[in-house]
């Protein structure tokens, strides 16, 4: 009887132990799940990139290489460079793989471009630049052209493609090299543009490329000249915008007082470009006089210079024209002097200069103010005298009113006088001859009268003595 009871005891004990084990395992699992959150699992995709010949490499999103994978890239320190005109620029570009001549070919190109991709913000410039090259693509460097270099330190230059090869310092040819720096010695209109580093596989397939955009600028110099004018003539001024870059980067406007001047009616423009590529623009305004204006207006030249598409600077200069009354000048000969009379001249700042046969004489003149100009307030009349030349012959005596600003016509007058003795004695001789002829004529008249009177008396018979 004891054997069946033993079997029952063992079975019950087994069940109790099994239940305890399951309960413990369940509690441990629940405790673990509460104290440590489960970490979600992400699947990292593989990104396929451009490869060299015979490469099946891939790079995942975390930047780590998968088995048998490698990304081939070209990296430059800067992608946009903007510097002042004539400044040097260093561009440092590297490849992620060594450029072995048997596997790769690296080339550097220059795409000559203007800085404005769309419509230029400035005015159109009417000039012809015979020295400029059109927008084109130039090959500067190629690892496949190692034997065409002609100058030490200038390796890789493709001959006859650039006007001056010394514009650049090019990379050295190194088997398996990864560094391909390029230096522009002086940035100007020839060297501004987009520089492209391109890596090709042996079969000519483009592996990768990158670009660096280089732009340059030069701020303009603004000069305004307000021209003097005579009363009743147009107001004139000239604005010179010199040595600026880029092309079509200046917007110019004229203002009379605060009102903008009609560009098509009253403004003329001319532009020129120098061999260095800098532009100079000359703008001239000529505005008719408004008789209703009481005062002379102010003329202002204002420019907006765009260094690039997003930034600009405004520069302006203004001035008021000086208006003068044209004087009346006349020269005459009086009492052995040449006399110059100038009417309606400024009371200060002007004077008379003489010339004899276009030469300045050494004889001083005597200048004096003779009164005020009745038709123009603030102006005076003046007179200058100088002795006539004692030399024989014909002389031109010119009187010039000096002191007026440049831009006005010359105010002068000229008289011709001959001081030869024959010419000087001719009036006396003429007088003597006239008196003599007059006296002779008078004597002849008296004689004729006497003869006539004598002949008109009646004749009488002779008397005889016996008649007495």
UniProtKB/Swiss-Prot annotation:
Residues 220-311, 321-416 form the Ig-like domain. GO terms for cellular component: membrane; virion membrane. It is found in: Virion membrane. Glycans are attached at residues 46, 57, 62, 92, 100, 131, 203, 208, 269. One of its GO terms (biological process) is adhesion receptor-mediated virion attachment to host cell. Keywords: Disulfide bond, Glycoprotein, Host-virus interaction, Immunoglobulin domain, Inhibition of host complement factors by virus, Membrane, Repeat, Signal, Transmembrane, Transmembrane helix, Viral attachment to host adhesion receptor, Viral attachment to host cell, Viral immunoevasion, Virion, Virus entry into host cell. Essential for the initial attachment to heparan sulfate moieties of the host cell surface proteoglycans. Also plays a role in host immune evasion by inhibiting the host complement cascade activation. Interacts with host complement component C3; this interaction inhibits host immune response by disregulating complement cascade. This is Envelope glycoprotein C.
């Amino acid at each position: 009887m004891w054997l069946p009871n033993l079997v029952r005891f063992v079975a019950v004990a087994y069940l109790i132990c099994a239940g305890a084990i399951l309960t413990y395992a369940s509690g441990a699992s629940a405790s673990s799940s509460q104290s440590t959150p489960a970490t979600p699992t992400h699947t990292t995709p593989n990104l396929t990139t451009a490869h060299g010949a015979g490469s099946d490499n891939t790079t995942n999103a975390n930047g780590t290489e998968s088995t048998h994978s490698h990304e081939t890239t070209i990296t430059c320190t800067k992608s946009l460079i903007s510097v002042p005109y004539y400044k040097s620029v260093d561009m440092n570009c590297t490849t992620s793989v060594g450029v072995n001549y048997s596997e790769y070919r690296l080339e550097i190109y220059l795409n000559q471009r203007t800085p404005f991709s769309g419509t230029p913000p400035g005015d159109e410039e009417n000039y012809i630049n015979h020295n400029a090259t059109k927008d084109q693509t130039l090959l500067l460097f190629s690892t496949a052209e190692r034997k065409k270099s002609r100058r030490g330190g200038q390796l890789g230059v493709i001959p006859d493609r650039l006007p001056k090869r010394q514009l650049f310092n090019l990379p050295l040819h190194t088997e398996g090299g990864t560094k391909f720096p390029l230096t522009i010695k002086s940035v100007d209109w020839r060297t501004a543009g987009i520089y492209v580093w391109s890596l090709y596989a042996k079969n000519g397939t483009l592996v990768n490329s990158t670009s660096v955009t280089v732009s340059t600028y030069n701020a303009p110099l603004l000069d305004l000249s307000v021209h003097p004018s005579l009363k009743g003539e147009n107001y004139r001024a000239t604005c010179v915008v010199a040595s600026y870059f880029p092309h079509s980067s200046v917007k110019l406007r004229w203002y009379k007082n605060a009102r903008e001047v009609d560009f098509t009616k009253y403004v003329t423009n001319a532009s020129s470009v120098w061999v260095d590529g800098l532009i100079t623009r000359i703008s001239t305004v000529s505005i008719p006089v408004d008789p209703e204006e009481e005062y002379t207006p102010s003329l202002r030249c204002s420019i907006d210079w765009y260094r690039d598409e997003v930034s600009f600077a405004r520069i302006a200069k203004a001035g008021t024209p000086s208006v003068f009354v044209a004087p009346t000048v006349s020269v005459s000969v009086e009492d052995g002097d040449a006399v110059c009379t100038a009417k309606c001249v400024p009371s200060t700042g002007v004077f008379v200069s003489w010339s004899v046969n276009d030469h300045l004489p050494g004889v001083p003149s005597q200048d004096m103010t003779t009164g005020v100009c009745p038709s123009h307030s603030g102006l005076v009349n003046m007179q200058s005298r100088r002795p006539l030349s004692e030399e024989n012959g014909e002389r031109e005596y010119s009187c010039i009113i000096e002191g007026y600003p440049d831009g006005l016509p010359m105010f002068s007058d000229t008289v011709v006088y001959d001081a030869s003795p024959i010419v000087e004695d001719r009036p006396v001789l003429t007088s003597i001859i006239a008196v003599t002829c007059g006296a002779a004529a008078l004597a002849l008249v008296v004689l004729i009268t006497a003869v006539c009177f004598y002949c008109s008396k009646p004749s009488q018979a002779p008397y005889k003595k016996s008649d007495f």
